[in-house]
Structure formats: structure tokens, C-alpha cells
A protein has these predicted regions:
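Extended catalytic cores of very large enzyme megasubunits
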Residues: 1-148
Length: 148
């Protein structure tokens, strides 16, 4: 395995976008990033020889997994693997669609949505504005903001 990427540009993109920072050690090398991906995503889903071949192919830039999975493999993806996806889709046909979209966006994943008549006709009408003294307390987390 090689710690070097072929060009300065590739090295910059790796260090600035995908390499985790480790206190006292600095940023990961390309090897470290691929190993983190392998340990956390590939795991033991394939036999050791296939796992080694996959690692070598990624290391040599012959194949590339989702860059979001390279970036988030580890603790972030263990908490919620939504962060590993580049994009998602949902039909806006229920009020919970808005909660789901907010949560997915807060995880860093894009959300495409449908507002076709057959979907949005299932939503309740929005009431007229009215004065209220109600205070809403929002838990400062992805889940809290999505439910607010």
C-alpha cells in the first residue's frame, strides 16, 4: 500500500474532505482512510482475500466507493448510516415527510422530493395564521430539529 496519491490535487482533496483528524497525530493518510472504510463498511462481509483485493483496488484508485462513505465511515455512520448516502427521495404525502426530509438533510444527505398532485392531495390544508403565546422547546440535535 502507498501513502501517496498520484497528484497534489488528489492529495489536497483527500486531506481536506475525507481524511479524519486524530488528536496528536494529524490527518489520516490515504492508507488510513481506506483502512477505516474497510474496517467499518466492508467489515467481514466478504472473505479475507476479496477484502484485500477491494482494499488494494481502492488504494490504487481502480475502483472508488461512495465518497460520503469514505468520509463518514466510523463513529458517524455507526450512529446513523443515513450520512453515508449522497442523495435520497421521498414523496411528500404525509406530514412526517417534512420531519424525514429535515433529518436526512441534517445528516448531510440530499433529498429529492415529489409534489405531484396525487401525493400532496394527501396533506392536510394549512390553517390561517393565528396569534399564539406557545413556546416550543427544541432539543438541539438532528432528531430534535427534525421533530420541531
Amino acid at each position: 500500500m502507498s501513502n501517496q496519491l498520484p497528484t497534489d490535487y488528489q492529495a489536497f482533496i483527500h486531506k481536506s474532505r475525507y481524511a479524519k483528524y486524530h488528536e496528536g497525530q494529524g490527518r489520516e493518510s490515504w492508507d488510513d482512510t481506506v483502512t477505516r472504510f474497510s474496517v467499518n463498511v466492508i467489515r467481514d462481509m466478504v472473505d479475507p482475500e476479496t477484502k484485500y483485493q477491494l482494499e488494494q483496488a481502492i488504494m490504487g484508485l481502480e475502483v472508488m466507493p461512495s465518497m460520503r462513505s469514505l468520509m463518514t465511515a466510523g463513529a458517524a455512520a455507526e450512529r446513523d448510516n443515513t450520512c453515508m448516502y449522497n442523495c435520497s427521495y421521498l414523496a411528500v404525502d404525509d406530514l412526517k415527510s417534512f420531519d424525514e426530509a429535515m433529518f436526512i438533510l441534517l445528516c448531510g444527505t440530499g433529498v429529492g422530493f415529489s409534489v405531484e398532485r396525487q401525493s400532496i392531495s394527501k396533506l392536510p390544508e394549512v390553517p390561517e395564521l393565528f396569534q399564539s403565546e406557545t413556546n416550543i422547546v427544541v432539543k438541539d440535535s438532528k432528531e430534535g430539529w427534525a421533530k420541531a
